[in-house]
Amino acid sequence: MIIPLIKGLSLTLKRFLNPWTCETEAYPEKKPHLAQRFRGLPELQIEEDGKEKCVACGLCAKACPSNCITVEGAEDEETNRRYPEVYELNAFRCIFCGFCEEACPVSAVILKDTFELSTYKETGIFDKEKLLDLTRKRKGLKGPS
């Protein structure tokens, strides 16, 4: 009974006396290092010409186990290309599993490193423009083209 107590105290003293073994990070001032496989908020990707990659097939919504994605497609009459007229992501319901990313045939949905999602209820539902703005901001692009 006394030996585990001594082991615990020795570990505590060793950590206390050696300043190089500090595990605490100054989070708000210094962003944490995220693993390469980290899954954060899904973002809609943009093609080189500035148009969205999504073809509104709805596979991401079907693959989502938490039903947090809503897609309604429409067709562009000039190019005969489908696009999402409505694309909504409910960040409160999302479990960041990555199934939407795996299901997308054109790689339009990618889980990025956005993890600071504390927000009010009104702003937790991301529509198409909010998701595209996240990608534009990351790539340094201006508003819609």
Summary of predicted features, one role per range:
Residues C97:
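Basic, alpha-helical nucleic-acid-binding regions used in initiation and control of genome expression
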Residues M1-R82, E88, F92-R93, E102, ...:
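Non-ligating segments of multi-cofactor redox enzymes
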